[in-house]
Curated annotation (Swiss-Prot):
PANTHER family: LEUCINE--TRNA LIGASE, MITOCHONDRIAL, LEUCYL-TRNA SYNTHETASE. HAMAP family: Leu_tRNA_synth_B (MF_00049_B). Pfam families: Anticodon_1, tRNA-synt_1_2, tRNA-synt_1g. This is Leucine--tRNA ligase. Its EC number is 6.1.1.4. GO terms for biological process: leucyl-tRNA aminoacylation. It is found in: Cytoplasm. A motif ('HIGH' region) lies at residues 40-51. GO terms for cellular component: cytosol. Disulfide bonds: none annotated.
Length: 819
């Protein structure tokens, strides 16, 4: 019989849908298992095979756990708010909702074709009003707890896009979307007080089964450090500086303020106002990432003012420097160029003094003055001495600081969740009540922003201006929207109870499913999404509305999928199919030599592979199999369509083996042993997520199994059941072909018996006077007499003419003839 995936795959996909095979149930008699993908943004480009690595891995685990008898939740949804759909709307006038729905339909078609076992009854998009009603409600929980507030913030603002951007949405001073210039501006924004949970976010990492690299990234992002705050007096107020090295205080030769520091205007002398204003303007065109990058030179400008050193009382020049950020510490740095590389670069750039106050061993030197004797001290002892001095003289105090800053939550966009707040003229505001949610955005024709810092919602006067019946006052709706992160902060909780119209989730369902047992997604989300989701979850835990302190028990980052790209230097990428190899070099149709690389699959590099093309040619099961075979789940891997073809050839052989007339009711030990060993290897591989080893295990199995004269039917059935998580369509077809009822998953995961793993034979080492002379494969239950006779025969040429004084016999291991 011939294997034809085109005939069987759609048939079994319809069977799964009609039978609701993957519908999750809260069954208290079963152990639950919640396996989740980081859900995708439904872009117009659709999926390429790079996206499928993680999706295939979670699907294998979900199918395996169902077969083991777990109650499995394996859902899929859409992170559907975001800037790309809005930019497309600006260019074309097409409503973002229409674009999003079209893209989702395409994504669903692609995922269905791969045979993924999602519980489609729980599907939703973050742009569904039924969903973002609860996003708005959860935001209001943060607001009511004082964790959401408005403040004037230095932000990355893109005039062309008309919105604030996160650092991750900027590259080399330009927006990732569209490549438009970005500048720094002070704007009134909504902010979430994530810093209030800094310690909980740090401590919670210790309990998580996550990659150490991800945990370290989050620790670095939070950036907890202990030190001291030091007060430097000026004519216009006190400059508070945070330092982790109070023991170097005597070595301060300048202060550097962030350009956004509130004292800059007051401290700038009349003579310096013009150059300071110009410097601040230039700084506004730089992102924070650019400002703190490791440059060989540092930029800055003198304010014309001085501060008094708290110990020596010397006058210290006050500079403005863009490498100082307003959000960390106090937005001011004490420059100790002798003992800080950045400070030294700055001092050398502007010819400032360099005063050494530590010797090579880290012992304080040159650090004594009246009432202050630091010389000879080092390390924590020296730091504590300075802190005690500062506290006793009311010049500072011990302090813990964090790099983590409160989360800028506003976006000046249309396609995002409206923030459910009404503002009044006196500066007060009112959160909307539950019955007023969801707050829907108005239908508009022009999606462009309304002036600096105002999103397109601000244009719709009849929507913005309201009479609030609760307070009997005229008010204005908030015109900022939430960032795309908002919907992804809690979607995993909504999957527990996706269509609850009375609450974001029912308590008993959250208690049943949470936490997520396995979460797989890209390493690019290591900090922001994962940190923001943990923050919201810990707020909910403190509020008593979730039962676990952490949302994601185990995290795995899949590696990147690389593919060959072809680029004309200085011009751009070309499609691989038009590149030609001539005389050992790759050239474009124009004859220009190409730069050939292995790079991450992407639309921009023209090296993405449409999975549907591969499915049409080789079948979904072959694509799934190669997606795992291509390399370890967490490592980068190079994609090869030839590899998919190889997996298709294996499936052809497997189909032929199962459909062979050699399959019979038989208890052939060797055949059963091969099947049991296969199942054990597949089980171990799935448990350890070493999924790349599974295809080779099957290939080794079939190479040995087809040598048998008879294929024991029970062994064949075991192999089919073991293949089902990886290649589900062919497994379903073959399961029925073997005479079973449809639904291979219902048959359970095959049990492995130890006696078949050990085999019927053992290898005996035969020695003469301790030297290896032969090996024997003999039956395990062979008697001592049989073993000795066979051993003597195998070593006969070494025993000829010799007297055997003793035969040492170690059962199942060796025979040693002493002659």
């Amino acid at each position: 019989m011939r294997y034809d995936p085109g005939l069987i795959e759609e048939k079994w996909q319809k069977f799964w849908e009609n039978e609701q095979v993957f519908k999750a149930e809260e069954d208290e008699t079963k152990t639950k298992y919640y396996v989740l993908d980081m859900f995708p943004y439904p872009s117009g480009a659709g999926l390429h095979v790079g996206h499928l690595i993680g999706y295939t891995a979670t699907d294998i685990v979900a199918r395996y756990k169902r077969a083991q008898g777990f109650s499995v939740l394996h859902p899929m949804g859409w992170d559907s708010f975001g800037l790309p759909a809005e930019q497309y709307a600006i260019r074309t006038g097409t409503h973002p909702r229409e674009t999003t729905e079209k893209n989702i339909a395409n994504f669903k078609k692609q995922l269905t074709a791969m045979g993924f076992s999602y519980d489609e009854s729980r599907e939703f998009a973050t742009s569904d009003p039924e969903y973002y009603k609860w996003t708005q409600k959860l935001f209001l929980i943060l607001y009511e707890k004082g964790l959401a507030y408005m403040a004037d913030m230095a932000v990355n603002y893109c005039p062309e896009l008309g919105t604030v951007l996160s650092n991750e949405e900027i590259e080399n001073g330009f927006s990732v979307d569209g490549g438009y210039p970005v500048e720094r501006r002070m704007l009134r924004q909504w902010v979430l007080r994530i810093t209030a949970f800094a310690d909980q976010l740090l401590e919670g990492l210790d309990e998580l089964d996550w990659p150490e690299s991800v945990k370290q990234l989050q620790k670095n992002w939070i950036g907890k450090s202990s030190g001291a705050s030091v007060n430097f007096a000026t004519e216009h107020g006190v400059i508070e500086v945070f330092t982790t090295r109070p023991d170097t205080l005597i070595g301060v030769s300048f202060l550097a303020l962030a350009p956004e520091h509130p004292l800059v205007d007051l401290l700038t002398s009349d003579e310096q106002k013009a150059v300071v204003a110009q410097y601040i303007k230039e700084t506004q065109s730089k992102s924070e990432r650019d400002r703190i990058s490791e440059m060989k030179t540092k930029s800055g400008v003198f304010t014309g003012s001085y501060a008094k050193h708290p110990v020596t009382h010397k006058l210290i020049p006050i500079w403005i420097a863009d490498y100082v950020l307003i959000g960390f510490g106090s937005g001011a740095v004490m420059g100790v160029p002798a003992h800080d590389e950045r400070d030294l670069l700055f001092a050398e750039q502007f010819n400032l003094p360099v005063v050494s106050v530590l010797n090579k061993e880290g012992v304080c030197i040159n650090s004594c003055c009246e009432g202050f004797h630091l010389d000879g001290l080092s390390g924590e002892e020296a730091k504590q001495y300075v802190i005690n001095f500062l506290e006793e003289n009311h010049l500072g105090a011990a302090k813990i600081a964090y790099k983590l800053r409160d989360w800028l939550f506003s976006r000046q966009r249309y396609w995002g969740e409206p923030i459910p707040i009404i503002h009044f003229e006196d500066g007060s505001c009112r959160p909307l009540r539950d019955y007023e949610l969801p707050l829907l955005p108005p239908e508009i024709q022009d999606y462009r922003p309304e002036g600096v810092g105002q999103g397109p919602l601000a244009k719709v006067r009849e929507w913005v201006q309201v009479f609030d019946t609760e307070t009997q006052r005229a008010g204005k709706r908030e015109t900022h929207t939430m960032p795309q992160w908002a919907g992804s902060c809690w979607y995993y909780l909504r999957f527990c109870d996706a269509h609850n119209s009375a609450a974001p989730w029912a308590k008993e369902k959250e208690q049943y499913w949470m936490p997520v047992d396995l979460y797989i997604g890209g390493a690019e989300h290591a900090v922001l999404h994962l940190l923001y989701a943990r923050f919201w979850h810990q707020v909910f835990y403190e509020a008593g509305i979730v039962s676990t302190p952490e949302p994601f028990k185990k995290l795995v980052n899949q590696g990147l999928v690389l593919a060959t790209s072809y680029r004309i230097p200085g011009k751009g990428y070309i499609y691989p199919e038009i590149a030609k190899e001539e005389n050992g070099k790759w050239v474009a149709p124009s004859g220009e030599e190409l730069d050939v690389r292995q790079e991450k699959m992407s639309k921009s590099k023209l090296n993405g592979v449409d999975p549907q093309i591969l499915i049409d040619e080789f079948g979904a099961d072959a694509v799934r199999m190669y997606a795992m075979f291509s390399g370890p789940l967490d490592k980068n891997k190079l994609w090869s369509n030839q590899g998919v073809a190889g997996c298709r050839r294996f499936l052809n052989r497997f189909y032929e083996m199962v459909s062979s007339d050699r399959v019979k009711e038989d208890n052939n030990f060797e055949g059963l042993s091969l099947a049991h060993k296969l199942v054990q290897r597949v089980t171990d591989a799935i448990e350890k997520l070493s999924l790349n080893t599974i295809p080779s295990s099957f290939m080794e199995f079939i190479n040995d199994f087809v040598k048998l004269a008879v294929y024991p039917k029970s062994a064949v059935e075991m192999a089919v059941r073991a293949l089902a998580p990886i290649a589900p369509h062919i497994s379903e077809e073959l399961w029925v072909l073997l005479g079973n009822s449809p639904g291979v998953q219902k048959s359970g995961w095959p049990s492995v018996l130890p006696e078949y793993l050990e085999g019927q034979t053992v290898t005996i080492v035969v020695q003469v006077n301790g030297k290896l002379r032969a090996r024997l494969d003999i039956m395990k239950d062979a008697s001592k007499e049989e073993v000795l006779a066979l051993a003597r025969e195998s070593a006969s040429k070494y025993l000829e003419g010799c007297e055997v004084k003793k035969a040492i016999f170690v059962p199942a291991r060796l025979v040693n003839f002493v002659v």
